[in-house]
Amino acid sequence: MKKQNNLRSLAAQAVEQVVEQGQSLSNVLPPLQQKVADKDKALLQELCFGVLRTLSQLEWLINKLMSRPMTGKQRTVHYLIMVGFYQLLYTRVPPHAALAETVEGAVAIKRPQLKGLINGVLRQFQRQQETLLNEFATSDARFLHPGWLVKRLQNAYPTQWQRIIDANNQRPPMWLRVNRTHHTRDGWLGLLEDAGMKGYPHPDYPDAVRLETPAPVHALPGFAEGWVTVQDASAQGCAVFLAPQNGEHILDLCAAPGGKTSHILEVAPEADVLAVDIDEQRLSRVYDNLKRLGMKATVKQGDGRYPAQWCGEQQFDRILLDAPCSATGVIRRHPDIKWLRRDRDIAELAQLQAEILDAVWPRLKPGGTLVYATCSVLPEENRDQIKTFLQRTPDAALSETGTPDQPGQQNLPGGEEGDGFFYAKLIKK
């Protein structure tokens, strides 16, 4: 069993890999969790997610309390001090334990000579905490978002940007999707209650259930048997707008990790579904999801810009394009997004989205439906993207979602407690 004081150093290393090396926390965290006892996995996750959620504040505090930054091989200590601040500010770890374990973390990262420095900075913070937090409350860092993203949100949502930022800074609820081929939603809610848990149905998405309190999946009735899947309510809107029917040929493009593929098959079990994604590693999760749910689909690796490479001349009755995007609508669920994205990424993503739309549109049958979806809240990837697509595509018409001047439906994070999501339903004339 690993010593618990390794948790702080592991959390510091994880955050450093995200911020300094641009790695996704979902890739960094699992191997680190293998290094700690089962009872400590939740705390390690809390420290990593929490530090990334509040990184602006923790960085601001370090700049106030240290005369010069830690650089080079000492850089991990910079993030170790952040882990200490986070514990003192946001967790129920007793302050004396937070200090002691964080200071000991210096030994684990082979910087024992800096134990005194870490201890001194954390104790100085304790002494000045009230004054520092009052000053922080009026600083630009208080939004806990990078400045470029704050500006984009202010421009796009002059009256709602603060609400979006506040929602992004909250912990996300746990949403589930009841597999209608096994149970009705009300029937499964009864099983959940029998298991001592409570859930609430979504008013618009017929399979969605929000847990009153998040729970491990193995505690959910029938999870292993495929009765229920973890999926945010807003993501479930994709299949609602797509409205798949049995017997149809359906393309799920950019399909990994397969949550929407399986939802399509739950709604239309006799549909012929092709799931395509460019990332071969992530496609393994599509197979895993289909296997757990006992479903079958054709799964291929491919680039959405070149459909001839993965489907020849085949045409489809319905296409779901869950386009690659900035993921600015799911920041509360993936706080590392704030520090992985750059302002310049948005134009590049919008260009990629346009190329995929143009490439895949000819593969839709006349009278067919294409649902364009993103987990972004930025208009360049959403409303503006569809507006320009409609202008250059005479045989495309908007259906159900918005108007030609304001196309699509934009869900903001926290609305009905779902993530930020955009949908545009297009019909081929």
Curated annotation (Swiss-Prot):
Keywords (A to Z) from UniProt = Cytoplasm, Methyltransferase, RNA-binding, rRNA processing, S-adenosyl-L-methionine, Transferase
Cite a single GO BP annotation: regulation of DNA-templated transcription
Binding-site positions, S-adenosyl-L-methionine: 254-260, 277, 303, 322
**Protein's UniProt keywords contain Methyltransferase:** yes
Under catalytic activity, the entry for this protein gives: cytidine(967) in 16S rRNA + S-adenosyl-L-methionine = 5-methylcytidine(967) in 16S rRNA + S-adenosyl-L-homocysteine + H(+)
Task: Provide the leader sequence positions.
Answer: none
Q: Family, per the entry?
A: Belongs to the class I-like SAM-binding methyltransferase superfamily. RsmB/NOP family.
Function per UniProt: Specifically methylates the cytosine at position 967 (m5C967) of 16S rRNA.
Annotated HAMAP family: 16SrRNA_methyltr_B (MF_01856)
NCBIfam families documented for this protein: PRK10901.1, PRK14902.1, rsmB
Protein's UniProt name = Ribosomal RNA small subunit methyltransferase B
